[in-house]
Amino acid sequence: MPVGVPKVPYRLPGESAPQWVDLYNRLYRQRLLFMGQELGDELSNQLCGIMIYLFAEDPSIPLFMYINSPGGSVTSGLGVFDIATVMMQDVTTICVGIAASMASLVLSGGSTGQRLALPHARMMIHQPEGGSRGQASDVMYESSEVERLRDIVVDCYVERTHQSRETIIIDLNRDLFMSPRQARSYGLIDAVALPAVKEEYTGFSMFS
């Protein structure tokens, strides 16, 4: 039986008594964002809206986005990627579990030096897919649009990984899975996050 989203206490500024809010709402207030499901319009709009709101509230405080997603809609992924890369605010992206397809592109869109993966995470890149059905004119239009989106995705990976365009095109032709070390060498992330020594634990440490 599903338990739903847990609720946790949170005291609003100026309030004497805490209120019970859902876990993700509480974490958003701490500038911790989660992409924990397939990326569609609803999740994309939520993430983009939260990032824009938090940027407007205080652009000097960084955001942290935890990613455990199989990917999803190309346009939804590009929306989150664009917001993360164009805002004048540090966005740390962290792969927890898997960042596949468009989720791997969002992962790569974190601020330079702040794109991380946990030790046993997996990343996967491949080219956008389209389901061409219907009349011939519709199929041709969709094929053209898929090619356009594919070129955009290739350009984004080239910019974020510094791999050659030829390398990216070849690698996107199949499901290319990577370990954190491989993703770091590829340029998809900057470092692998490791827990610090227990006695001195303050969060995650990194090695490059």
Curated annotation (Swiss-Prot):
Note the PROSITE patterns from the entry. CLP_PROTEASE_HIS, CLP_PROTEASE_SER
Q: List the EC numbers from the record.
A: 3.4.21.92
GO MF, one term, reads:
ATP-dependent peptidase activity
The chain's disulfide connectivity reads none
Pfam families assigned? CLP_protease
As its record notes, the protein acts as a catalyst of:
Hydrolysis of proteins to small peptides in the presence of ATP and magnesium. alpha-casein is the usual test substrate. In the absence of ATP, only oligopeptides shorter than five residues are hydrolyzed (such as succinyl-Leu-Tyr-|-NHMec, and Leu-Tyr-Leu-|-Tyr-Trp, in which cleavage of the -Tyr-|-Leu- and -Tyr-|-Trp bonds also occurs)
User: Per the similarity annotation, which family is this?
Assistant: Belongs to the peptidase S14 family.
Q: Subunit structure, per the record?
A: Component of the chloroplastic Clp protease core complex.
Name of the protein: ATP-dependent Clp protease proteolytic subunit
Lineage runs: Eukaryota, Viridiplantae, Chlorophyta, Nephroselmidophyceae, Nephroselmidales
Gene name of this polypeptide = clpP
